[in-house]
């Protein structure tokens, strides 16, 4: 049967992960995302995880699927061992917030942009991204879902970290949705369509991003970690 939003929120709170996704196959694969504290409109990695479950447990013959989210249709294609997710492009808009964002990150920021959900702070090099120790309380005062910090990469085209205390996640391990903004930005700066990206959280992760006319395709892999029943 269906479960209501309040129950979804309680389950996400108990799971205590960045986001928990809920798929309703009776409603044409409607998908909902909850952080431990709030419903969010889009979560890329929870979409990839949901697609993995869909292809391996719900429809084993399918090679693509569409999830209906608060942010519109999210298409995922199965390509051998990888999953390719299509997200709407998120165009960065330059904002004059360097001082406030530098203060929140405890480092010198070169430029600041705003996407649909997040602020994007560009710093001088990848080493700064890896070593910053931000002020989470100051980031929580920003009027955004999260704050992305990024620089040109060494082994990859760009590196990033994502902080989201406003949605109950001090630092997200890997953030698919942030790459709709990151890939759009770096694609223009580096004049590239296809890029390898690294998120430098403690757990870390690498993604392949391809910038198309209206969408960003993000390629990643998923593994089954846990299977069970929830009683509520």
Where are the language model's segments positioned?
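Active-site proximal loop and beta-alpha junction motif in alpha/beta enzyme cores
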Residues: 1-42, 48-232
């Amino acid at each position: 049967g269906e479960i209501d939003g309040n129950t979804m929120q309680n389950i996400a709170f108990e799971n205590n992960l960045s986001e928990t996704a809920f798929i309703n196959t009776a409603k044409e694969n409607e998908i909902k995302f909850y952080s431990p504290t709030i419903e969010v409109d889009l979560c890329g990695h929870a979409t990839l995880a949901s697609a993995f479950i869909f292809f391996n447990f719900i429809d084993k013959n399918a090679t693509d699927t569409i999830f209906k989210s608060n942010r519109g249709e999210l298409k995922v294609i199965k390509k051998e061992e990888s999953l390719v997710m299509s997200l709407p492009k998120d165009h960065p808009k330059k904002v004059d917030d360097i001082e406030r964002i530098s203060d929140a990150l405890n480092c010198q920021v070169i430029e600041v942009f705003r996407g649909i959900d997040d602020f994007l702070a560009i710093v001088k090099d990848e080493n700064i991204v890896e070593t910053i120790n931000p002020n989470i309380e100051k980031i929580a005062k920003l009027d955004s879902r999260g704050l992305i910090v990024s620089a040109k990469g060494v082994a990859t085209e760009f590196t990033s970290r994502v902080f989201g205390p406003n949605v109950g996640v001090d630092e997200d391990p890997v953030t698919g949705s942030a790459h709709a903004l990151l890939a759009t930005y770096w694609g223009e700066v580096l004049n590239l369509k296809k890029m390898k990206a690294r998120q430098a959280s403690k757990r870390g992760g690498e993604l392949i991003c391809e910038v198309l006319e209206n969408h960003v395709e993000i390629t990643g892999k998923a593994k089954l970690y846990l299977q069970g029943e929830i009683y509520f």
